[in-house]
UniProtKB/Swiss-Prot annotation:
Catalytic reaction annotation: L-seryl-[protein] + ATP = O-phospho-L-seryl-[protein] + ADP + H(+); L-threonyl-[protein] + ATP = O-phospho-L-threonyl-[protein] + ADP + H(+)
Gene Ontology BP annotations: cellular response to hypoxia; chloroplast organization; protein phosphorylation; response to abscisic acid
Function: Serine/threonine protein kinase that specifically phosphorylates chloroplast precursor proteins in the cytosol within the cleavable presequences (transit peptides). May be part of a cytosolic regulatory network involved in chloroplast protein import. Does not phosphorylate mitochondrion precursor proteins. Specific for ATP and does not utilize other NTPs. Plays a role in chloroplast biogenesis and differentiation in cotyledons, possibly through phosphorylation of chloroplast preproteins.
Entry similarity comment: Belongs to the protein kinase superfamily. Ser/Thr protein kinase family.
GO cellular component: cytosol
The name this protein goes by in its record: Serine/threonine-protein kinase STY46
Recorded phenotype for the gene knockout or disruption: Retarded growth.
Post-translational modification: Autophosphorylated on serine and threonine residues. Autophosphorylated at Thr-443.
Region (Disordered), start-end ranges: 116-140
Activity regulation note: Activated by autophosphorylation at Thr-443.
Entry annotation: catalytic residues: 411 (proton acceptor)
Record carries keyword Kinase: yes
Provenance organism: Arabidopsis thaliana
Gene: STY46
Organism lineage: Eukaryota, Viridiplantae, Streptophyta, Embryophyta, Tracheophyta
Domain Protein kinase, residue spans: 290-543
Length: 575
């Protein structure tokens, strides 16, 4: 999961002479060393026995090194003992019997701008008003401005209601719970953990997720919603719920219908990943005709190559054998199952797949233009206005086709939109797509937080309108060229979307009808979002109006005429 670190003005001045990437790297390493030294000093001063053992300093440094630099940047050095707890949990997670290792603490967030040292006071009736002095430690990773502001609002509300209620249950007066998980890193882990918390009625107020260099995770959530000011019952409840999720993850709901061996009563090792076949299509790739070229991209669970199949240029997505498990196989099977029947000019064309472990791969048409995400955020490209509308409508047409065939994509984002040499955009990556249930609603959670609909984040039932919300975020990306919620981590953005109604800021110069459409696309109530067929009509209408305005004004020679979004003008030119 991508997380962002923001430089201070001072650090940019100090490293002004260095290349940006080198300056950022040096800054992070320097801060990591400073944090390590401070944590070590505090642990030794607190007379923690382990801190004085031979080799402890090296062990602590190894702990910082196996986690991303962001861990050192975010951790609260005043809670040095929490670093030891994180180290212990990660060590405990080595044993499969201990997974997930769980720790629960009571924490208290200090409202921004209010002193933590104010004593409790008495009102005229002789009752003691709630004290503002924290009786519990702060969260291990401090707190975001949003969480501090939330605590401040609750504290002020508490002041207003003090005369009417002695036992005020505001966020500030009632401590929060900080829950730390450590387990083996795997696909969809965050979704499982957030689903676990939701099942217990817990509301996530703050979240931090870290992956170690050796394949483990450290996930920290600050939550409210537990009715008791204690930790043991909550920990036991979490362990019970985690056991249920672990059992569910070991099963494959569609295995029975997918597996001919099981239907025939056969047992033994599978020779291929079972995928439904109605006998009308042949999609198993003959590896003799598949030629690999250079690697295009690499991820945690697979690599993407350019190649040829029977002399046709293709893209080959290969799953890494060492990362294969039932979850990844299920995702692979689902992608093949859906893509083999999809035929549309705005959906990436499936050519075939190899389903014989350990060489699992999916072969599709090659898209030389790359992804919309790379074009916008890495190449700093700009779509000229007519092209922007064309791209937006292309995506709509592809998604409308999928929805007409009862397919919900569930992970619509700029990285999953690919361009050919003619700037035709096609929807790709169906690894987490699903055929809509007959009931019309679904409850499995996946996708990427920055683009995810609130009902999916909250693990509530959802339908095809979840894709419409994601499309709204993509359309905003096309207009601005910016990453959604770029100054927040993905988890912080998710909390903001659900609990505070957070949405990307629509630039002031946006055409009024387009601004209105964006707001409809990311409505919290999914029933208020339009279908893709309606979106296509509205975009075509807006494009026509903007074109007419441009013709009348005759002021733009760049194709970015002043009707819709003057802020689209950037120094980078389209190529």
């Amino acid at each position: 999961m991508v997380m962002e670190d923001n430089e201070s003005c001072a650090s940019r001045v100090i490293f002004d002479a260095l290349p940006t990437s080198q300056a950022t790297m040096d800054r992070r390493e320097r801060i990591k060393m400073e944090v390590f030294d401070e944590v070590l000093r505090r642990l030794r001063q607190s007379d923690i026995e382990d801190a004085h053992l031979p080799g402890f300093e090296d062990d602590l440094w190894n702990h910082f090194n196996r986690l991303p630099a962001r861990y050192a940047l975010d951790v609260n050095v005043e809670r040095a003992e929490d670093v030891l707890m994180h180290k212990r949990l990660l060590h405990s997670a080595y044993d499969p019997q201990n997974r997930p290792a769980i720790e629960v603490h009571l924490v208290q967030v200090q409202p921004a701008g209010i002193s933590a040292d104010l004593d409790s006071t008495s009102n005229d009736a002789g009752h003691s008003s709630p004290t503002r002095k924290s009786i519990h430690p702060p969260p291990a990773f401090g707190s975001s401005p949003n969480l501090e502001a939330l605590a401040l609002a609750a504290s002020l509300s508490q002041d207003e209601d003090a005369d009417n209620s002695v036992h005020n249950n505001s966020l500030y007066s009632r401590p929060l719970h900080e829950i730390t998980f450590s387990t083996e890193d795997k696909p969809k882990l965050l979704f499982q953990l957030t689903a676990l918390l939701a099942e217990l009625g817990l509301n996530i107020q703050e979240a931090h997720a870290f992956s170690t260099t050796d394949g483990y995770s450290l996930d920290v959530f600050v939550v409210d919603g537990w009715p008791y000011e204690e930790t043991e019952r909550l920990r036991i409840s979490l362990e019970k719920e985690a056991a249920k999720i672990e059992l569910q993850s070991q099963s494959w709901p569609m295995q029975q219908s997918f597996s001919p061996e099981k239907e025939n009563g056969q047992t033994g090792a599978r020779t291929h990943v079972p995928i439904p076949n109605d006998g009308t299509d042949v999609w198993e790739i003959n590896l003799k005709h598949l030629k690999f070229g250079h690697k295009i991209a690499s991820g945690s669970y697979g690599d993407l190559y350019k190649g040829t199949y029977c002399s046709q240029e293709v893209a080959i997505k290969v799953l890494k054998p060492e990362r294969l498990d039932s979850d990844l196989e299920k995702e692979f099977a689902q992608e093949v199952f859906i893509m083999r029947k999809v035929r549309h000019k705005n959906v990436v064309q499936f050519i075939g797949a190899c389903t014989k472990p350990p060489h699992l791969c999916i072969v599709t048409e090659f898209m030389p233009g790359g992804s919309v995400y790379d074009y916008l955020h890495k190449q700093k490209g700009v779509f000229k206005l007519p092209t922007l509308f064309k791209v937006a409508i292309d995506i709509c047409k592809g998604m409308s086709y999928l929805h007409q065939n009862n397919i919900i994509h569930r992970d619509l984002k700029a990285a999953n939109l690919l361009m050919d040499e003619n700037e035709v955009v096609k929807v790709a990556d169906f690894g987490v797509a699903r055929v809509k249930a007959q009931t019309g609603v679904m409850t499995a959670e996946t996708g990427t937080y920055r683009w995810m609909a609130p009902e999916v984040i909250e693990h509530k039932p959802y339908d095809h309108k979840a894709d419409v919300f994601s499309y709204g975020i993509v359309l905003w990306e096309l207009l601005t060229g910016k990453l959604p919620y770029e100054y927040m981590t993905p988890l912080q953005a998710a909390v903001g979307v659900v609990q505070k109604g957070l949405r990307p800021t629509i630039p002031k110069n946006t055409h009024p009808k387009l601004a209105e459409l964006l707001e409809r696309l990311w409505e919290h109530d999914s029933t208020q979002r339009p279908d893709f067929s309606e979106i296509i009509e509205q975009l075509q209408e807006i494009a026509k109006e903007v074109g007419e305005e441009g013709e009348e004004k005759k002021k733009s020679s760049t194709g970015l005429g002043g009707g819709i979004f003057a802020a689209l003008r950037r120094s980078t030119t389209h190529h």
